Amino acid sequence: MLFTIIYDLFHFPARSIFWGAELILALFIYYKLKIPSGTYFAVLVLFLMNIFGEIFFGLFYIIQNFDKFIHLFSSFAVCTLFYSIFEKKISSKKILILFSFTIVLSIELIWEITEYFADNWFHLILAGVHIAGEQAFKPIEMVSSYEDTIYDMLLNFIGGTIFAITALFLTRTKKKLAKNSKKECHHKV
């Protein structure tokens, strides 16, 4: 991982800041937060998909819609992360689900705005889907940055919605199971 940041630092300085921040966040989550291992595993997979998709294997350029899958999966994984972090602090499960969903969509909005300004001010080519070889100085744009931004935000919304529906279903199922176990306890007495 450190190699990735160093490699990126010399080739794409602005992106290395992103990778470094993501690595620090992953280490913080692992060492400081008490979250379920499944949630941590999902966040780790997301981190590795970003690294391998961009740097090592170029999966963004090889596998069609790899970027789109990451946006769908990332919103689900990060919603789950925020749910796990704030589960003990917010007692209402519905508000907790809505809070997690809203935070993730807000982060996505900030990220897409950052991509827009990074592309327009620093010509970093963060938005859009491009084809680029090692020697390419001007990548070929496959999907425009505006279209890419809309699809990214839509897929993050869909991933967050899948999280919300799943979390609501699991919350209701858990309540029903708790209610049924209380009834069984009363019948046994």
List where the protein language model places each region:
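Bulky hydrophobic segments
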Residues: 1-150, 157-189
